[in-house]
Amino acid sequence: MSASLPLVFDAPRRGMPPRHLADLSADERRAAVTELGEKPFRARQLAHHYFGRLNADVESMTDIPAGSRAKLGADLLPTLLTPVRNLDTDEGTTRKTLWRAHDGTLLESVLMRYPDRATVCISSQAGCGMACPFCATGQGGLQRNLSTAEIVDQVRSAAAMMRDGEVPGGPGRLSNVVFMGMGEPLANYKRVINAVHRICDPAPEGLGLSQRSVTVSTVGLVPAIRRMTAEDLHVTLAVSLHTPDDELRDTLVPVNNRWKVEEVLQAARGYADHTGRRVSIEYALIRDINDQPWRADLLGKLLHKHLGQFVHVNLIPLNPTPGSKWDASPKPVEREFVRRVREAGVPCTVRDTRGQEIAAACGQLAAEE
């Protein structure tokens, strides 16, 4: 059970897309529009269409003169992501979209509609450099970081799908965004933080979602967690822990060789103290690997010690990936694990796994044509 891939923190610089409206702050948009010889208010018009109306087609923006549309479109609304295909499951309420970026890079996002909410799971990198052996994305390696606008455009597209009733249940609203698709969000720190602002700033400066409805996941990049604490955001922090002991985590989550479990939990506590937000602990339960009763007891003890009331455990039955020798724990083992964690005073629930049939569930995104 050795980690064969190296950890990669710095993505290759190749292939980044042209600049886009969603890469820029409101002031930067005005400056960009002025550089093109247009009046500054055109920036707000473009933002109103893109963020407010979820419209990326500049030719349909008839309140902008035809002569300006081509110029503004080419420079500030280039097509970043083209859908290659949609795969649906759960009677159409789970949709995985494979996207092709301008340089041919492939990435995936997943829209999940529930009775009371709609969540999009988005990618922050094409591939991932964290090399976790039970995750298809990690085993594929890292191609490159996504730009702020490539991240935001996944959310805009999902919001438009919901508004237009493309998912069964009629027209609706996108309510939640989780950075749990391809990539380690905090390894693409600046662009992810900028994307959070675009997602949460009120329209027309952004998409207008509440910060409390956004979750940013990490395998435990301690300096980046501390840096995010200082940003004064109120998004939910999710830590992919997967085991409470350093010996096994060094293999399951290779970044643990750099920052140990206790350091990660201390950084998470700092975030919880600063924001008043509960930290979500993600734990993929793997048969005979990390599902032992003593690990449940240790997990509960450590989380109670470091995070107290500011924690919730999401237990994820392992989703199968091609070529993997591991599978999910049996249900009785899972139930006993939950019972033991709760006995330590730590809330623990089993995640409703969506999209397994179309390789859209946690750890399955491989962006293959």
From Swiss-Prot:
Q: Check the record and name the SUPFAM superfamilies matching this protein.
A: Radical SAM enzymes (SSF102114)
Positions of [4Fe-4S] cluster binding: C128, C132, C135
- UniProt EC number: 2.1.1.192
- Give a GO cellular-component term: cytoplasm
Q: Where is the signal peptide?
A: none
Return one GO MF term: 4 iron, 4 sulfur cluster binding
UniProt superkingdom: Bacteria
Q: Which cofactor is essential here? A: [4Fe-4S] cluster
Location in the cell reads: Cytoplasm
Q: State where it is primarily located.
A: cytoplasm
Top-tier EC class: transferase
HAMAP family, alphabetized: RNA_methyltr_RlmN
NCBIfam families to which the protein is assigned, alphabetical: rRNA_mod_RlmN (TIGR00048)
Name assigned to this protein: Probable dual-specificity RNA methyltransferase RlmN
